[in-house]
């Protein structure tokens, strides 16, 4: 009838694992279909993967890209109340940090940015989102590192610098595990020291630290 399928024979553990893996892949593909990526800003720092063809994403993955200007975030950030800021400090920051961040303008703007983005993605029902951050918000208001870290901690798929390939990967991984996902790039592998160096942009779920 024209449907793609895979034939698997046997009852050993390897065969069962093949069936399980294929089933999970099918479920993920179906879940990815008809999802929406919220895109705040444009390509960050000249990244090639910061550009995406909406028609191709819809054709290949069934994913819609819905763009928003960064000004929407700034407007929402200005509307955040002091009570909301204190709630984040007590319930999101305090449980994960041994020392509270400085009580200054930078910290307040970072929290406001987080709350603004969270409100917008909930209002628009985005399934995942990308954000430019550099250049743009980070220069004019605050870096998105805290925002991204808290979103990853809560299992919300996201990527900075409008990296569309990255956010798709985070979405898939987030649906395969209950644990927070970390995204980073391999910088180097030191075989003698047996060390792999992975770099990111400051975004990491705090529960993964230590």
Can you annotate each of these PLM segments?
Residues 7, 11-14, 49, 102-105, ...:
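Catalytic cores of large soluble enzymes that bind and process phosphate-bearing ligands
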Residues 1-33, 45-46, 195-199:
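Cofactor- and metal-binding active-site motifs of prokaryotic enzymes
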Residues 11-17, 71-77, 189-191:
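A short acidic, often aromatic-flanked loop/helix-cap motif at beta-alpha or helix-coil junctions
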């Amino acid at each position: 009838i024209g449907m793609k399928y895979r034939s698997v024979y046997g009852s050993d553990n390897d065969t069962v694992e093949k069936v399980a893996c294929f089933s999970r892949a099918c479920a993920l593909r179906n879940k990815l279909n008809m999802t929406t990526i919220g895109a705040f800003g444009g390509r960050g720092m000249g990244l090639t993967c910061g550009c995406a063809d909406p028609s191709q994403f819809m054709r290949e993955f069934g994913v819609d890209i819905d763009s928003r200007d960064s000004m929407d975030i700034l407007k929402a950030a200005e509307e955040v109340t002091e009570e909301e800021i204190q709630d984040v400090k007590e319930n999101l920051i305090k449980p994960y940090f041994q020392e509270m961040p400085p009580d200054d303008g930078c910290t307040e703007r970072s929290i406001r940015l987080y709350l603004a983005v969270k409100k917008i993605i909930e209002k628009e029902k985005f399934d995942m989102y990308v954000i430019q951050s550099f250049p743009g918000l980070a220069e004019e208001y605050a870096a998105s590192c805290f925002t991204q870290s808290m979103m990853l901690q809560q299992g919300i798929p996201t990527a900075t610098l409008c990296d569309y390939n990255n956010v798709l990967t985070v979405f898939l991984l987030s649906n395969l595990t209950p644990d927070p996902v970390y995204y980073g790039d391999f910088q180097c592998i030191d075989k003698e020291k047996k060390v792999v160096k992975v770099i990111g942009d400051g975004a990491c779920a705090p529960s993964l630290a230590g």
